Swiss-Prot record:
GO terms for biological process: chromosome condensation; sperm DNA condensation. The gene is PRM1. Keywords: Chromosome, Developmental protein, Differentiation, Disulfide bond, DNA condensation, DNA-binding, Nucleosome core, Nucleus, Spermatogenesis. Residues 17-28, 35-51 have a biased composition (Basic residues). GO terms for cellular component: nucleosome; nucleus. The lineage of its organism: Eukaryota, Metazoa, Chordata, Craniata, Vertebrata. Its main location: nucleus. InterPro entries: Protamine_P1. This is Sperm protamine P1. Cross-linked by interchain disulfide bonds around the DNA-helix. It comes from the Eukaryota. Testis.
Amino acid sequence: MARYRCCRSQSRSRCYRQRQRSRRRKRQSCQTQRRAMRCCRRRSRMRRRRH
C-alpha cells in the first residue's frame, strides 16, 4: 500500500510516494496518484494567491 503525498511547488508533475515508516512528517496523503496530482495543483494555487 503505497500512498502518494502532495508534491512541492518545484515539481508539480511528479508525486512522491510516502512510506509508512515516516510517521513524523504528517502531510496530506492520497491513496491514488491522481489525487496526489490534484493536491499538487491545489497547493500551487494556494501559494500563488498568498504571494
